[in-house]
Amino acid sequence: MNITELMELFSNPETIKTLETGDLMTGIGVTVVLGMGITVVALIFLMYIIGGMAAIMAEKPKEVKETAAAAPKPEAAAAPAPAANNDEELVAVIAAAVAAQLGTSASNLIIRNVTRSLDTTPAWGRAGIVDQMATRL
């Protein structure tokens, strides 16, 4: 029995029961290989489509044209004066938040140093934290 006839017999559930063990195992193997083969080919096809789309959508480096007249170099800007004022406000806000958390007055606290810590939480983690704070508290 060739594979085409065997697959025709596999299309009817009643005829599967009449097959010999060897033919049944051959049909099962052909079905599995055919199914996996089609899946692998489809995934490879999708891989190439996605790769092509990524190549099309990728930003191309912009070419900078040199002009004959050199643009004047910007001078270094002076540091803004209100920065010290913002630091004092930041310390006041942090002191108020800590005092509120501890249930005491801000005048009872002594803040010696305020340093920024690096946030290594991924974007999805920050989104989860915001979601929990918004919906569960």
Swiss-Prot record:
Keywords: Cell membrane, Ion transport, Membrane, Sodium, Sodium transport, Translocase, Transmembrane, Transmembrane helix, Transport. The chain crosses the membrane at residues 30-50. It is found in: Cell membrane. Its EC number is 7.2.4.3. The keyword Transport applies. InterPro entries: Na_pump_deCOase. GO terms for molecular function: decarboxylation-driven active transmembrane transporter activity; sodium ion transmembrane transporter activity. It catalyses: (S)-methylmalonyl-CoA + Na(+)(in) + H(+)(out) = propanoyl-CoA + Na(+)(out) + CO2. The methylmalonyl-CoA decarboxylase is composed of four subunits: the carboxyltransferase alpha subunit (MmdA), the tunnel beta subunit (MmdB), the biotin-containing gamma subunit (MmdC) and the delta subunit (MmdD). Belongs to the OadG family. This is Methylmalonyl-CoA decarboxylase subunit delta. The gene is mmdD.
